[in-house]
Each structure stands twice: as C-alpha cells, then as structure tokens.
Amino acid sequence: MKEKDIQKLIDRAIVARDKTYSPYSHFGVGAALLCEDGTIYEGCNIENASYGLTNCAERTAIFKAVSEGQTKFKALAVVADTEGPCAPCGACRQVISEFEIPRIIMANLRGDYTVVEL
C-alpha cells in the first residue's frame, strides 16, 4: 500500500474513534476497513455494562461491511490513544483471520504505525 492510502485509512479510523461508546473503560478505539472495491467501512468500540457483550472497533467495521454484502478486503486500520501502535485483541484476530484481511495497520494518535501482513 502507498503511504497516502495508509494515512487515509488511519485518518478514517481516527474519525471512527470519535464515535466510541466507552463509558466504563474510557478507552476509545477506531477502525477503518478498506474493501477490494475501494469502499471504506468505519467502526468504533461499543461497550456494555456486561463486558462480554462489548464489541470492538475492528469487529464493528468488519460486521458492517459483511452485512452490506462485502466479502473481499484489502486492509484494516485500528487506532487508539496508546503508547505504541494498537494491536487487535484475540477475538478480533480470529474474525480478521476468518475474513482473510491481508493487511493490518496498527496505529496510535501520536502518528506511529506498523503494517503487518497476514
């Protein structure tokens, strides 16, 4: 991916993060999923008082895309206010693997990022 495309996806994930519902952890996460056709779906984490029912930003973006008929993906960016780039949790990694998303862009609000390929 080109640098400008990576940055665009990170920027969209930052916008998504602003919509987070995280009254319990106060830890907002945003994600942006780039589909093969160029469409981008955003997602944020949505918490619940019953923590097990919380949905992560990555899964929110993926589920939105799949519910709209998308099945081919190019990359997923995830952003949080962390010291280093933010990595997906185990549940999100499982869903990322299931849908064969080839590139994960892990970023933070400081401008740091790492791209990993599956």
Residue ranges and their predicted role:
Residues N45-R59:
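Compact, glycine-rich, soluble single-domain proteins
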Residues H26-C35:
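Short beta-strand scaffold segments in enzyme catalytic cores
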Residues C35-D37, L109:
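Short acidic-glycine loop/turn motifs at beta-strand connectors
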